[in-house]
Amino acid sequence: KAYTVKKRDIIRSYVGVDIDPAVLTEKAGFHSPTGQVMDSAWFKNFTGRLDIQDLTVNPKFDVEDESIDFFWTTEVIEHMKPEFIRPWLEDAHRVLRPGGLVYVSTPNHDGSNDKLPEDHVYEWGFRELHDELTRNWELDIVVGTFCQMPRLRKAMQKDMREEGEMRWTEDQFDILKARFGKQFLRVVAATFYPEIANNCAWILRKPK
């Protein structure tokens, strides 16, 4: 018997925060009787809410203490000056229930280019961001999402010199390269080397 999973079966309610009012306008191809995201059927299935807020001016969420299960932020941190990050994360900690899940994806400057993209204000280094995120939360896992191949090769060689083994063996690496090609290999191989990856995905939890 077929079963349709609706968004509301998984997510009871949702609060999204963005600085740009343009996010309230529905994209072409999605039906909205008013042209607004919040009037689209898919968004109503989320029981959602969208707040327009500049977190550098007001880092406080309009959310009750310990009332959310999941805090998700992707490609946001690099667009804010570092002094604004801690107040924002502190308030995320406030609204997250004990045992709640945190997902953070952001560039890792240790694996990136020295010259930042124009819209990146600041990119955190791997250890720097690790220390900030684990001030309040326990780290479940961090993985690289893609990397520069020369950096990966150097990291593998460093592992061999210092540990006597690599997180990827040369044979595994060559098989993956033959199967997926260089571009996809940048994604697969980065998983085990977050400290030198261009971008990292962090999964953390609020202690119970």
Where are these regions (language model features)?
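Conserved SAM-binding loop of SAM-dependent methyltransferases across substrates and taxa
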Residues: 1-11
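Structural alpha-helical scaffold elements that stabilize or flank donor/cofactor-binding regions
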Residues: 7, 63-64
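Conserved SAM/SAH-binding beta-strand->alpha-helix loop
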Residues: 20-22
